[in-house]
From Swiss-Prot:
<dbReference type="GO" id="GO:0008502">
    <property type="term" value="F:melatonin receptor activity"/>
</dbReference>
<comment type="function">
    <text>G protein-coupled receptor that plays a role in numerous physiological processes including regulation of energy metabolism, neurite outgrowth or cell migration. Promotes self-renewal and neuronal differentiation of neural progenitor cells through activation of the NOTCH and WNT/beta-catenin signaling pathways. Modulates the KAT5-dependent glucocorticoid receptor signaling by modulating KAT5 subcellular compartmentalisation.</text>
</comment>
<feature type="transmembrane region" description="Helical; Name=6">
    <location>
        <begin position="114"/>
        <end position="119"/>
    </location>
</feature>
<dbReference type="InterPro" id="IPR002280">
    <property type="entry name" value="Mel_rcpt_1X"/>
</dbReference>
<feature type="transmembrane region" description="Helical; Name=4">
    <location>
        <begin position="18"/>
        <end position="38"/>
    </location>
</feature>
<keyword id="KW-1133">Transmembrane helix</keyword>
<comment type="similarity">
    <text>Belongs to the G-protein coupled receptor 1 family.</text>
</comment>
<dbReference type="GO" id="GO:0014069">
    <property type="term" value="C:postsynaptic density"/>
</dbReference>
<dbReference type="GO" id="GO:0005886">
    <property type="term" value="C:plasma membrane"/>
</dbReference>
<comment type="subunit">
    <text>Homodimer, and heterodimer with MTNR1A and MTNR1B. Interacts with KAT5. Interacts with RTN4 isoform A/NOGO-A. Interacts with TGFBR1.</text>
</comment>
<protein>
    <recommendedName>
        <fullName>Melatonin-related receptor</fullName>
    </recommendedName>
</protein>
<keyword id="KW-1003">Cell membrane</keyword>
<keyword id="KW-0812">Transmembrane</keyword>
<dbReference type="InterPro" id="IPR000025">
    <property type="entry name" value="Melatonin_rcpt"/>
</dbReference>
<feature type="topological domain" description="Cytoplasmic">
    <location>
        <begin position="84"/>
        <end position="113"/>
    </location>
</feature>
<feature type="topological domain" description="Extracellular">
    <location>
        <begin position="39"/>
        <end position="62"/>
    </location>
</feature>
<keyword id="KW-0770">Synapse</keyword>
Length: 119
């Protein structure tokens, strides 16, 4: 997304210092993402699988929040990025050489890729 839609800023954004900042932000967000599991749910041991797991089944609000954060939000972000890339690619193409049948095929291919990503 950054390379295609923001190509002029791409090299400036991926300097070593900025890359380190992006890595730190990613790790901080990951830790913040796990913290609700520690404070809201309970950690239980499953002797059948010899593992510990977070038990938050009795809290439906927490379950809905987790689904929104872990599924809906990434889906919206990826959908936005794919749409912006698609718009950029279509805008940069030569409109004189386009065939209406090709446009329909391109839309169908884009939607197929997006649905496959969803699955």
């Amino acid at each position: 997304y950054c390379y295609i839609c923001h190509s002029l800023q791409y090299n400036a954004d991926l300097q070593p210092a900025n890359t380190c900042i992006y890595l730190v932000v990613t790790w901080v967000m990951t830790v913040l993402d796990v913290l609700p599991n520690v404070y809201i749910g309970t950690i239980e041991y499953d002797p059948r699988t010899y593992t510990c797991y977070f038990n938050y089944v009795n809290n439906p609000a927490f379950t809905v929040t987790i689904v929104c954060i872990h599924f809906v939000l990434p889906l919206i972000i990826v959908g936005y990025c794919y749409t912006k890339i698609w718009i950029k690619v279509l805008a940069d193409r030569d409109p004189a050489g386009q065939n209406p049948d090709n446009q329909f095929a391109e839309v169908r291919n884009f939607l197929t890729m997006f649905v496959i990503f969803l699955l």
